[in-house]
Each structure stands twice: as structure tokens, then as C-alpha cells.
A protein has these predicted regions:
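Acidic/glycine-enriched connector segments
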Residues: 18-96
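Short acidic-hydrophobic, aromatic-tinged amphipathic segments that line or gate anion-handling sites
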Residues: 99-101
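Conserved small/polar residues in nucleotide/adenosyl-binding loops
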Residues: 105-112
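Extreme N-terminal starter segment of soluble prokaryotic enzymes
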Residues: 3-5
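Active-site donor-nucleotide binding/catalytic segment of nucleotide-sugar enzymes
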Residues: 8-13, 37
Length: 116
């Protein structure tokens, strides 16, 4: 069964491992909702160096291409920053549906209760 792409965005805060944990939880929930999650924060750092200006720009361009190919933009978390606002604005220009936020804290609490 072919699942539509869903671009996952959020305010990514904390250290590298915290961000990876947040993104992994969000992507799992998106997958369980019937989508194929596209989350640049989980993928791009494996081969791009954000400290190199050209690679930083390439990362932004790759992320935008992921969004263009997505059917839905999923905004996760409890906060909105400029990056998330830009993702929402681009999705609107492209006619891509954007969801309401999903709380990482709520998902972790639910996941913990569910696992018991």
C-alpha cells in the first residue's frame, strides 16, 4: 500500500539527542496515522555539515523539496518559530494542507502509558 508523504516540522530544541528523540516520536505517530514521514532533521545531518554555509543552504533546499513532494505538512510541538512559520507559509502557497500542532510531551506521556 502506497502511503502519502507527510512533511514533519517542529521547533527543534535541545541537544542533538533530544531533537532526535522528539523527531522519532513524531515520525512514528505520523507513520501510525498512515503517512510516510519526511523529516529533514532526522536525515540531513548524516551527510550535510550545517556549519558549512553552502551545505546549510543545500539542507534548506532539500527540505523545501521534501515539502513540495508532500501531501500534508504536520506541525508538531507546543511552539512555533520562524522556521515553522516559513514551512506553513510555503505549504499554503503550494496548496498543501497543514495540521494543528501535536504535543511531544503529550505523545511521550501517552506512549509511556500505552507501553505499561
Amino acid at each position: 500500500m502506497k502511503k502519502p508523504f507527510a512533511y514533519v516540522t517542529a521547533v527543534w530544541q535541545g541537544g542533538e539527542f533530544t531533537v532526535i528523540d522528539q523527531a522519532t516520536v513524531y515520525c512514528r505517530k505520523v507513520y501510525e496515522a498512515g503517512f510516510t514521514p519526511l523529516c529533514p532533521v532526522l536525515y540531513l545531518p548524516h551527510f550535510l555539515r550545517d556549519s558549512v554555509p553552502a551545505e546549510h543552504k543545500d539542507g534548506i533546499d532539500i527540505g523545501r523539496e521534501f515539502l513540495r513532494r508532500s501531501r500534508v505538512l504536520i506541525v508538531c510541538g507546543d511552539e512555533i518559530d520562524e522556521t515553522v512559520k516559513n514551512d506553513i507559509a510555503m505549504a499554503q502557497r503550494l496548496g498543501i494542507t497543514a495540521t494543528t500542532p501535536v504535543s511531544y510531551t503529550h505523545l511521550r506521556a501517552h506512549e509511556t502509558r500505552h507501553d505499561l
